[in-house]
Amino acid sequence: MGITKKPDLNDPVLRAKLAKGMGHNYYGEPAWPNDLLYIFPVVILGTIACNVGLAVLEPSMIGEPADPFATPLEILPEWYFFPVFQILRTVPNKLLGVLLMVSVPTGLLTVPFLENVNKFQNPFRRPVATTVFLIGTAVALWLGIGATLPIDKSLTLGLFQID
């Protein structure tokens, strides 16, 4: 903090401006042209130079080269598609699976209308929204973890047996 420019609060002109409600726009260095023409390009070019330097000095393979003749037994999607993949994998009727996926954003869109005390920011004063968030997070985690398991253990996560 010793490097940054601090305003002189003993300056009577600055005190008068602050008393009138004129704040940070009336003291310090202007953003144009100092920041936008000199500091920002240096930071951006420095970041690009660091990335290019690391890519040139330490090139690493992302993974094994693809072998088109050896496919895995089960192809999994990216991790953020695991809950959706699990719904489609476990629901026997594909139309029902698609309708379940469409019902999630539709249900989330109805939450503000179910709970008309929107003026509060405290989550404890919005019990419906908080409950929907917590249950939705738990279900998404459950489905996401289940998508990585075999189909017979996917719904129970292997924690208990269903006959």
UniProtKB/Swiss-Prot annotation:
GO BP annotations listed: photosynthetic electron transport chain
SUPFAM superfamilies per UniProt: a domain/subunit of cytochrome bc1 complex (Ubiquinol-cytochrome c reductase) (SSF81648)
TM spans (from-to): 36-56, 95-115, 131-151
Signal peptide (residue range): none
Protein's UniProt keywords contain Chloroplast: yes
Subcellular location as annotated: Plastid, Chloroplast thylakoid membrane
Coiled-coil annotated spans: none
Keyword GTP-binding: no
Membrane topology, from the record: Multi-pass membrane protein
Assembly description: The 4 large subunits of the cytochrome b6-f complex are cytochrome b6, subunit IV (17 kDa polypeptide, petD), cytochrome f and the Rieske protein, while the 4 small subunits are petG, petL, petM and petN. The complex functions as a dimer.
Functional description taken from the UniProt entry: Component of the cytochrome b6-f complex, which mediates electron transfer between photosystem II (PSII) and photosystem I (PSI), cyclic electron flow around PSI, and state transitions.
Protein name: Cytochrome b6-f complex subunit 4
Source organism of the structure: Drimys granadensis
Source lineage: Eukaryota, Viridiplantae, Streptophyta, Embryophyta, Tracheophyta
UniProt gene name: petD
